[in-house]
């Protein structure tokens, strides 16, 4: 108040090194995002991904809003493209974009629709990838960046940076499990939805929401795991001072399936009749 500058605590060498690493990883992730977007719009394989997205009701506007792209099925498309932009193999491994195998490094994400995951400031800190074609090896349907210092799911809510304005306006957030659920809700106009990315809703996520909303509506999957997760999530959200309601999607469907089948108004009706947690 008196204009006296408080000296900042000197950062240790280790802290400075961590900051530098985080900046490099985020820069690599931003480059990867742009590469995946280019693959979606400028390759034959991208047309497959566009057809898949269109089939799920995801419009070009939503693709743009969430910076959705596609990872080519080749073993080193990203490694090669980002290598030319000055990203070392070590950096791409550290960022979780490449994996070192005995045969050499390979892209971690291959043949997947790519969804960048941003922190509240809009930095890309990781990715979710949804398989485009189930193959004989039955690779996992979803693959995420592994947990690191800068990609800690407890401190992130998927879609928060794009939903924030609408959440503040409505004083309410709708919380779903997966990023595809959140994207489908945005696609039909429920653009105050965010995803906790899995069923374990965390205190850090509740605090993030409490800064923007008064009330949260949990819309987890109707299966047993989703119901158990809802019970835990309700108490965590209440501890953060949030009003809580629970939305049950009929017919055991997840929000993504329901909203694609029945549309926005039917889902708004479910929000309106959601019971207090």
Give the label of every model feature segment.
Residues 173-175, 214-225, 247-248:
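Acidic beta-strand-to-loop metal/phosphate-binding motif
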Residues 13-34, 74-216, 230:
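Phosphate-handling DNA/RNA-contact segment within nucleic-acid enzymes
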Residues 208, 235-242:
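Arginine/glycine-rich "motif VI" loop of SF2 helicases in the C-terminal RecA-like domain
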Residues 20-64:
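Non-catalytic interaction/clamp surfaces of large macromolecular machines
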Residues 50-57, 234, 247-257:
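A glycine-rich phosphate-binding loop feature that marks nucleotide/adenosyl-phosphate handling sites
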